[in-house]
Regions:
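Conserved acidic donor-binding segment of nucleotide-sugar-dependent glycosyltransferases
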Residues: 314-322, 330-335
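A charged, aromatic-enriched C-terminal amphipathic alpha-helix characteristic of glycosyltransferases
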Residues: 336-381
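Nucleotide-activated donor-binding/catalytic signature segment of Leloir-type glycosyltransferases, i.e.
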Residues: 50-51, 238-259
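Glycosyltransferase donor-sugar binding loop
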Residues: 35-40, 224-241, 257-258
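Membrane-proximal helix-turn-helix segments that form the acceptor-binding/catalytic region
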Residues: 121-142
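Short hydrophobic beta-strand element within catalytic cores of glycosyltransferases
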Residues: 296-299
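Aromatic "clamp/platform" in nucleotide-sugar-dependent glycosyltransferases that forms part
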Residues: 279
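A conserved mid-protein helix/loop that constitutes part of the nucleotide-sugar donor-binding site
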Residues: 13-24, 192, 201-215, 235-238
């Protein structure tokens, strides 16, 4: 019986990067069937593999039709691995659904994750979260990226412990093996470059770097520059760049535009440090990429980040820009501290799997012979009782 691999929920971002890394590293063969969006990164990952690919165009109706087609393949014993997202619609009872779950905000209801959205935009995000919660509940097994979120799923939201697994993140082969095939904008050669490798999602709190730049500007400290990877035409990018220009902070920022996974490694090598100021993450590939490429990491001080990074990062408070200024200045001025943080990051990375080990762990779970449909009580019920 073939293994169905459902990547249809993925269109961009870290999830797509992880899926491509899985396809490159996993020992898959013709006994697998991959369903995914029509994306060059997926097609490239499978180009030299004899793995059937069912590529679908973008659009909600194409997705619905494709997922119904996947569900029809089921006989109640067929395993479908969805990475990352809800299982195919209409598949409950037809397929044994194993899902990779990276929707951290669903497990932190105490955080107003969409506080930056108003009106219809906020309503849209709320409806999407409802669908994701409903879809995730219809899975049979759940794979999380961190122990912290897996514990929350079990202890606070009634996920059955014997059906919850953790597969820790690994550095993406696309990033580690990347060589640049595009011309990047010139980066200031005499500045300490801190890379924030992220899109313009409000959760990333990239705007906090403006407050950091203002604090540096007030001190006439021009030794630092933040390297951003934002799509130039995105409304959020235009607003951010307008704020930067309004305050006269252009010398503190360089936006290189969207960077494909296969080009990311070349950019990381050109920078001195990496940062992640997100309010919440399931797990960030920024962590393992910084450690693997021997760059110090600055990250939000929170339970989810400490659970993943241990002593392999400098913890900062984005709402208090002076904490970021102090961290950057120490990294720039104290070579021993810089080297120590790089070494600690490498030590934390040693506790994580390689891309091949991670892929093998996924396969060990989804190829188990004792997988069955879940017939127990509905998950999420504790959340309803607490609200």
């Amino acid at each position: 019986m073939s293994l169905l691999i459902n990547l249809i929920p993925l269109e961009a971002g870290g999830g797509l990067q992880n899926a491509c890394s899985f396809l490159l590293a996993a020992p898959l063969g013709r006994d697998c069937e991959v369903h995914a969006r029509r994306l060059k990164s997926i097609q490239s990952a499978l180009a030299k593999r004899e793995i059937p690919l069912r590529a679908i165009p973008h659009g909600a109706m194409y997705r619905l039709r494709a997922e119904w087609g996947i569900a029809r393949k089921g006989d109640g014993k067929q395993v479908c691995f969805t990475l990352f997202g809800p299982p195919p619609v209409f598949s409950k009872g037809r397929l044994i659904n194993v899902v990779g779950c990276a929707y951290a905000n669903l497990f932190y209801p105490e955080l107003d994750f969409w506080s930056n959205h108003k009106g219809l935009a906020r309503l849209k995000k709320t409806v999407i979260d409802w669908y994701r919660r409903w879809g995730i509940a219809r899975a049979d097994y759940w794979i999380f990226e961190t122990d912290a979120i897996a514990r929350r799923a079990i202890e606070r939201f009634s996920f059955p412990p014997d059906r919850v697994f953790v597969v820790r993140m690994a550095p993406s082969r696309l990033v580690l093996e990347s060589v640049t095939t595009r011309t990047l904008p010139e980066l200031p050669p005499d500045r300490f470059l801190t890379l924030y490798l992220a899109g313009p999602h409000p959760n990333k709190r990239i705007g906090a770097l403006i407050d950091v730049a203002l604090a540096l500007h007030a001190r006439a400290d021009t030794r630092f520059c933040f390297v951003l990877t934002l799509p130039p035409d995105a409304p959020q990018t235009r607003l951010l760049m307008e704020r930067i220009a309004r305050y006269g902070l252009e010398r503190y920022f360089v936006n290189v535009g969207t960077v494909k996974p296969e080009h990311a490694g070349a950019l990381i090598r050109r920078c001195h440090a990496m940062c992640n100021l997100a309010r919440l993450e399931s797990f960030s590939s920024n962590f393992v990429e910084a450690w693997a490429m021997r760059k110090p990491l600055l990250v939000t001080d929170a339970d989810w980040s400490r659970a993943s990074c241990a002593d392999g990062a400098v913890y900062v408070h984005p709402e208090r820009p002076q904490t970021i200024v102090a961290a950057l200045q120490r990294l720039h001025e104290d070579k021993d501290f810089y080297a120590s943080l790089v070494a600690r990051g490498a030590g934390v990375l040693d506790t994580y799997p390689s891309a091949e080990q991670k892929a093998e762990h996924y396969l060990e779970i989804i190829r188990r012979r004792d997988l069955t449909s879940y017939r127990g009580p509905s998950v999420w019920r504790k959340r309803a009782a607490q609200s």
